[in-house]
């Protein structure tokens, strides 16, 4: 009789452990895919939508500025992003300090590098998606690693050993964080989102290198002939 009770107890124990394991696995699976269908989709931006970021680079240290949707050109199918800091806009014009300034495509939020749109984001977000793009002078192979708490996390590696890690917020419609490390492991660019808002009032800036050259020429010209 005691042997029978022991056998029944062991069976019940094993069954409980099995169920616990299944529950744990299901919970882990659910946690790894916790984005709503809406959050997985390509966002639609509006003029004035903005994101306040802290930018960190080895050249310039830490600075904060807002990326702002300054214009929507439905004819060309492009957004134009400006920035609230003129200094940051000038840095971008000289050394491509911020790759998300300027034109981005409406249909994919593709970023322009050397005049060609680059698919940095993969909508709708799906774990395991893999794709390639060029950004920051590097050719990247990227993979969507996880969907968690409304965010899609992407890991990318370049042929030169650089690493790019970034998180896209489905609820805020843009990057939550981005970190670019070079082949030595040094952080070359870090972006951290502080707050996202729908309306912006104020000046925004975007310069190309040609703009700065023209501006310098005009200033020098005025000094000479005044």
Regions inferred by a protein language model and the residue ranges of each:
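Acidic, serine/threonine-rich low-complexity disordered tracts
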Residues: 23-91, 110-226
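Bacterial N-terminal signal peptides that target proteins for export
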Residues: 1-9
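A cross-kingdom signal targeting lumenal/periplasmic-facing segments of multi-pass membrane
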Residues: 95-111
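C-terminal motif of bacterial Sec signal peptides marking the signal peptidase cleavage site
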Residues: 17-21
């Amino acid at each position: 009789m005691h042997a029978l009770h022991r056998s029944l107890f062991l069976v019940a124990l094993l069954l409980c452990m099995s169920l616990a394991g299944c529950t744990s696995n299901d919970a882990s699976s659910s946690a790894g895919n916790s984005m709503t269908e809406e959050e997985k989709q390509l966002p639609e931006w509006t003029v004035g939508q903005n994101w306040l970021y802290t930018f960190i680079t080895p050249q310039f240290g830490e600075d904060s500025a807002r990326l702002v949707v300054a214009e929507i050109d439905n004819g060309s199918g492009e957004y134009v992003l400006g920035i609230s800091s003129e200094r940051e806009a000038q840095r971008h014009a000289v050394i491509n300090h911020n790759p998300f300034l300027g034109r981005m495509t409406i249909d994919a939020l593709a970023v322009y590098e050397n005049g060609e749109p680059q698919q940095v984001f993969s909508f709708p977000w799906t774990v395991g998606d893999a794709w390639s793009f060029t950004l920051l002078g590097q050719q990247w192979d990227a993979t969507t690693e996880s969907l968690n708490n409304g965010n899609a996390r992407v890991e990318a590696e370049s042929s030169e050993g650089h690493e790019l890690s970034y998180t896209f917020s489905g609820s805020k419609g843009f990057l939550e964080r981005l970190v670019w490390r070079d082949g030595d492991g040094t952080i070359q660019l870090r972006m951290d989102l502080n707050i996202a808002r729908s309306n912006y009032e104020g000046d925004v800036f975007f310069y190309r290198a040609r703009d700065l050259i023209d501006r310098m020429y005009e200033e020098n010209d005025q000094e000479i002939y005044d």
